[in-house]
Amino acid sequence: KMYTTAAALCLLGPEYRYGTDFVTNGTLDNGILKGDLIIRGSGDPTWSERFYDSNYDSVMVCFVDSLKALGISEINGKIIGDDNVFDDLHWGAGWMWDDEYEWHYAELSGLSFNENYIDYTLIPDSSTIGNPVIIEPLLKTSYINLRNDMVTVGSKAEEDWRYGRNHSTNDCWFEGDYSIQSGVDEADLTIHNPTLFTAHVLKEYLLDAGIKVNGNPVDADDLIDSIDYEQTSILFTYISHPMSRVIAEANQPSSNHIAETLQKTLGNELGEGGTSKEGLKIQMAFYDSLGMDVENLYLRDGSGLSRYNLVSPSNSTSLLQVMWDHDYRDDFVKSFPIAGVIGSIDDRMMGSNAVGSVHAKTGNMTNVSSLSGYAWTKSGEPMIFSIMVNNHMTGNSKVKPLQDKIAIILSDME
């Protein structure tokens, strides 16, 4: 993510914003939109609760309010989602197929809502052992089919539960035994076909707001005839947060979805199309122009999920140095997690001089853990570091304290 966000920030600029057009192929007559409502996806990754104070509703309510402001009370047509700004490869090269239901493996699309997953709250009924666990989706939608075969048990020793989503469907399930001693917990599941999901959820919000919709949600790829945008008119355009905010949301909590979207955006804006392959061409040319050793840098996706990626501490420290000397240094450094303060290291290095002084990006997969960034010494001198631990058998929970000790040593220096 550090590599992708650096390229996106420098090549597109901190004030770059996505613009998504809501258009129609019909006319507006006395409050009735006689035609389809078409969402022409721009690849905007900001339509999620992470950009709106953990509020799922905000962005959809904004869309509904914009249509209401135009006087629309009824749509006599379909809700069409168009994701063709990007290709239809929903995963990065080398991603693990058996993790497709996990939120960090959510499908990629040129039109997405809430990073294409749904959070669920698990609430055990403690009144009677054997009762079903209450499972509440934070986003209530009929787009998914939920099967709940999970019941309560007494002790933690008896607990054994699992959840998932059937391949290439929206059939989600929870099953097993959940201990009442575990209390309230959370889980998340990805959805299939983000474009149709977005159109479906928008229709639900429109209906809830009293706007009648006579047609069904549709993925533009399923239309018999392609959309001729020269024969449409723009109803309104939704403008995203700026790039400076987008990269912060990619780096601090570590969002794979945002990073992958940025890579395809680079391909769409500066290459020959919205694909990861085109985005990578732009990225590698950018690193080469900065004098980095691109012969020994092997990237295959935008987020770092792929096992095909091969980078070294030397690559990473070179990038960190280049960005330190860049005009956009402040935006880049501010996008990083901060030890003991925010992001993926907000609970690490506690009680040490590293708290507030180490700004570093994490990178973790099974048997792989890295920490790269900037550490300020006691005298305020910035230092660049990169720690990578590969092919270990101890688990990342035992590797991270070692990384923390090294970062603390740097921050303790005079």
Protein language model regions, located:
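Short, conserved micro-motifs enriched in small and acidic residues
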Residues: 2, 189-196, 306-310, 396-397
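Active/ligand-binding-proximal structured segments within catalytic/core domains
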Residues: 2-8
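Short alpha-helical basic/polar micro-motif
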Residues: 3, 200, 314
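Ser/Thr-centric signal marking residues that sit
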Residues: 4, 20, 362
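Conserved serine DD-peptidase/penicillin-binding transpeptidase domain
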Residues: 10-294, 409-413
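Small-residue-rich helix-loop
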Residues: 58, 241, 253-256, 260-414
